[in-house]
Curated annotation (Swiss-Prot):
The lineage of its organism: Eukaryota, Fungi, Dikarya, Ascomycota, Pezizomycotina. Pathway: Secondary metabolite biosynthesis. This is Dehydratase iacD. Its EC number is 1.-.-.-. The gene is iacD. It comes from Pestalotiopsis fici (strain W106-1 / CGMCC3.15140). The keyword RNA-binding does not apply. GO terms for molecular function: monooxygenase activity. Keywords: Monooxygenase, Oxidoreductase. InterPro entries: Dimeric_a/b-barrel, EthD_dom. Dehydratase; part of the gene cluster that mediates the biosynthesis of iso-A82775C, a enylepoxycyclohexane and biosynthetic precursor of the chloropestolide anticancer natural products. Within the cluster, the prenyltransferase iacE prenylates siccayne to generate pestalodiol E, using dimethylallyl diphosphate (DMAPP) as cosubstrate. The probable oxidoreductase iacF is then involved in the epoxidation of pestalodiol F to pestalodiol F, which is further converted to pestalofone A by the short-chain dehydrogenase/reductase iacG. Disruption phenotype: Reduces slightly the production of iso-A82775C.
Amino acid sequence: MAQQKVIKYTVEHNRKDGVSEEDFIEWFTNTLIPQMVPVMQKNNILKYAVHKTDHQISTAFQSQVDKVRPGWVVSKCDLILEHWVNDLGDIMKLSQDPEWAAALKDQDVWMDNSKSNIHIGYDTIYIEDGTITNVPRK
């Protein structure tokens, strides 16, 4: 029997205009994360990671990207939240959990959810720990 692929569900989030990057990260890390993670675990989230973007590096890199890939855009989001699940139903279950709603009660003070983007798919690893893997031989 083929092994089921784990689904990767990612969300790009932006802080609300007027909220400093420092205050946003402080709130996210020290207030929101401790409230969210236990509820995620309860709702079968297999793995959760946060990708914090660096606006200074992103802005500088955009000028380099423009030279080699005109039209490509370096994301301006503040956070990319990465969730791994066996079934997207677990994401839906999480979103309907009253504890989840309670954890997110202040999110509109801090985040501009009108700019959020969702990505759904699978990870396939081709280099891990410096070693090539999963590449068909010629």
